Each structure stands twice: as structure tokens, then as C-alpha cells.
């Protein structure tokens, strides 16, 4: 019997959990009287290919993971089960997130590409398919630019330059009898290819209106040019009363009093709609899981936490919720946060691994990783100023934190930088956007930095953090 999508995931989860190695890694000697140890070099313990297998599961088996959706929940369970199988105490921290409006396109191309898209909230949202031939119309902001042939068809437009422009495209298509409208974006906000989006309509429409990524819209244009026609089926879903989850794993020192200093290694595991999110940010999550494996049997005088945040792409919701719910005493316990986001791209212009803070200042985390880079004779690791990830809420709460990301920076003032063109798109997949060498370097540098902080006596680490 053919397995359903959910059954395949559950089977894979169970198989993956049962396959976890129980071999001790970097374990302290039983007769050691000290609370800190000399751990073997982290570089010999971490494996980029093993981390990328987590990336593969998240980005291919599960796929796009918009915040609060079922696919994000599957991802949280995968991460939690992996961490629990390593012996960590695992907690799922729920929090509310905004509604999601997700569109789905079935076509002859559906098997080769991802066709999850954004749906306009005030367009037709229906599980019943709207099926019709596709027609491409250039421009369309003027009614006389819309041919009568659009009647009864689904219209594909290059998205107008402004919200007002694409609203005119939609209204003109409706006036000519279109059964659906697909708007595809050409360029993203950071020089990347256009990503999926939820069109903001000024008028309620009785037909489906979807926002597509450039790769999706361009594929349809090519299909029409090659075959002359293609039939699409459009469905949409409004998901409400949503909850996302932070996955929090802890390993306390022996004879813990509950007041020990803590070190956090974090990432977010969600993605935007329509994007498999291999680099953004299954790569960070794969790194977190691989470092958790490497540190699972290491004994120190500190608590170590591995946290996978939900719904980062919706506005850092998971990390903000986590920090907001920490007492001042809990905040004071945290020595530093090593946050991994987009750590394995193969994009050649993203040539440096940066340790970024929101204000550009250095702290215990940046110092530890820059020192680690020196130990490893790695001159590609630099320090810089950047927000837009889960290190920000910690930094604003006075907790030393840094973002680790591959980027190319031409200028800091004004800020001119390079990230991969396939960021937030259906092309953010392992084949097109993941480098094992970049993943290994991130594992080595971040892992060595974490190890150095863990090995330092707590008092010395406190002084460094102050």
C-alpha cells in the first residue's frame, strides 16, 4: 500500500531515531576530580555530511516549513526526537503565531518543483480546486492591455512594481473574466530572486490570487512557450489559531544546583512558504544537531542548551518569546548565545563566515569564535554588524549573542552585502545551495568557540561576558 506523506515522515523519524549511534564522544574520565575537562578537538568529532543529512530530511522529506503549519510541527518533532535520543532533556515551548494563507498549484510541473505559494487573504480561499488553462499577460496595469482571451483562464503576470500596480493587474483580469491570478515577483528585498508572497488586495476578490516566486512564475512562462498551453488547478488554505514551538534541549552538569552558568547554541528551523529552506535554515539546524551530538557526553561545570526556534521568518517570534519568558535571574545565567543561520551556502560571493552582533560590538561569543578561527588558522572568519536573526532578542536583553552567517560585505556604511540569490526561494535546496566544505568550517569554528567557553572556569567566563 502506498504510504501517505505523513506516514513516510513518521517512518523516517522512527528509523532515524533508532539509528542514532550510542558511542561516547569526548567523555570525561570517571575518576576525574575536576568539573571541567580537556575535550578532544571538536574538529575531529563533527561531520559535515552527518549535519547535511539533517538538512536533507528537513528540506526534502518535510520541505517548506512556514511558521505554525503542520510541516513546521513535523520539523520540531524531528529535532526534538533527535535531541532526546542523544540524552538531552527536551522541552517544547508553544507560542501563538499569526494566521497563514497558503496556496497550492497542481500542474504538469508539480512533480519537479515546489508549488507552495502565498495566497491573498481577501481572495478566494478554498480547498475545492479552481481548474483552468493558463495564459501569460505582459504588464496588465491598464484594462486595454488585457486580451479578451483571459476569460475563463488563470492569468500569469509579472508582479507590478508597487502594491497599487499589482492591484490594477488583478482588478483588470477580474474585469475580463479571469478565473484566477498568479503574480510572480522578479526580485527580493536583498538582491535575491523573487520569493513567494501574500498579495495585499485593496478589494475583496472572488477568485484565487496567489503570489509566486520568480522560479515558479518563470517555469510557467517557459512551459507555455514550449507547449503552448497548460492546465493548472489552484487550491488555498487559511490556517488559523496557530501555534509554533521552540525546541529546547538541556544538559546540566553533574551535581547541578540549578544556578550554573549556561551556554546556548541555537538556530531557527522554519522556512518561508514555497522554500525548502536548505540553507535558510535547515543548515543552522543541522549544525545545532551535529554539535549536540558532539557535546552529548562532555562534562563541564556549565549547563549547555541547544535550541531550535520556531517562526523566525515571521519576525523572530520564537526567540522573542523565549527571551521574554526568562526571569532576570535566568538571563544573568546565560554566558552567551551562538546562533547559526545560513551557515552552508555555496554562493561564491558570500565568501566570509561572519560573527555578527546587532550593534557591531564584540562580546564573549564573537571573541571565542574569532580566537577559535585563529587556532584553526582560518582567516575567513570576520566580525561584523547585522540583525535579522534570533541573536537580536538576546542582545537587546543584555545577553552576549552573535549570528553566524556566510556573507560577502563590500561596505559597512552604507551597508552593501551579498547573500545567495536563491535565498527564500524554491531553489534553496541541497543541490543548488549547500556546500559541505562551508558546513564543516562553520561546525569547526562555532564548535571550537563553544568548547573553549565551556572549558573555561565559570568565574573567568563571567568576567569575559561582563
Which role fits each region the language model picked out?
Residues 20-35:
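Sec-dependent signal peptide cleavage junction
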Residues 33-70, 86, 93-95, 100, ...:
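N-terminal capping segment at the start of a domain
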Residues 35-37, 48-63, 82-89, 154-160, ...:
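Catalytic-core environment of secreted peptidases
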Residues 44-49, 53-154:
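Noncatalytic luminal/extracellular "stalk/propeptide" segments of secretory-pathway proteins
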Residues 69, 115-208, 380:
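Extracellular/luminal Protease-associated
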Residues 299-300, 309-408, 412-413:
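Metal-dependent peptidase/peptidase-like ectodomains
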Residues 413-466:
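His/Asp/Glu-rich mid-to-C-terminal helical/loop segments that flank catalytic regions of hydrolases
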